[in-house]
From Swiss-Prot:
It comes from Xenopus laevis (African clawed frog). Interacts (via C-terminus) with ctnnb1/beta-catenin (via Armadillo repeats); this interaction is required for inhibition of wnt-signaling. One of its GO terms (cellular component) is nucleus. Residues 256-373 form the Sox C-terminal domain. This is Transcription factor Sox-17-beta.1.
Amino acid sequence: MSSPDCGYSSDDQIQGSCSVPMMMGQYQWTEPLTVFQDLKPKRDEGSADSRSKAEGRIRRPMNAFMVWAKDERKRLAQQNPDLHNAELSKMLGKSWKSLTLATKRPFVEEAERLRVQHIQDYPDYKYRPRRKKQVKRMKREEDGFLPSANFPGSQIMDNNVMVGENYRMQYSAQNHQQNQLPPAGYFEGHNSMGYYYRDYSVPNYHISQNSSGYDSPPAQDEYQALSYSFNSSYMPYQQNATTPVMAKQMAVTQNIPQESPEHGMMASPQMYNRQMYVSECAKTHPMAQTEQHFPSYQSQKTVRQNYLQSQQDGHLESDIDKTEFDQYLMYEPKADMEIIYTIDQDSGAYSTNLLPSLITEANNVCYYDYCGV
């Protein structure tokens, strides 16, 4: 073997000396290379200046421990060459504490002499502690050598990881909850049974001047024609959302005795109207079940007369709180969207008067509901 590099170094040197200058000489960007060569001496000069400043810096006078440890450290380093400097410092500290005052006295006197000499040499000296270099500490924190429990500043990397994990967990939990929830606007107003009947098909029984009480509600065919015509597209959602409420209301209405309609009448006219309305909606055959839940017109008239007489006497006004039943109301009819039912006393036929605003409102709602689906 003639050479350790098998002759490759000679070829590289030839190529570097011949071919590279020929190729790079054609371009102008090769000229500033000389600038980098000029920077090297300046860098060396800067390091030399820093060294001279470090050497010219005035050092503090040594104390008694430093005077004793100066020679003792060298001796321990020779005896234990494998020990780190930190371990040597720990051993020196323990040894210094174990020494007696008589043994420490010569080192204390030497430290006092050095202090007096330092004052004489540098009368204007003022101790200025050097700033701690943060470069190494920051580098160690980035590398993760320092534990986060002892050094709060080293929690940067850990916090980033923890924040990312928490964000992922919260984001996944939110997505899971959003996937389980129904579409937006599904539960708006579904707390009550008659949400879709609220504006259009809720009857309002008015006391006519000729009659002395409330008129009986119309037949169920008219209810179905009014209620289901506006909201036929929402029936699947309504059945799913209002099944428990309807079952509860059906149970309440079925438990009311049929032979005593005064029980629901004397409490409040609104309770009577709601019970009659729920019983109508719960039954599918209007003609077969109308007579069971609605008493005859004469009996209703008698009940209404008794109720109005008691209201005029003022016996029930102090005992009944009218606002108590507001929390049980399942619908809130609007004043301008009411359907007024009246009875012709001569013919006994029902007549309905739809307000003009009802027709326009119904058309708008049907259009927006269809577009919203």
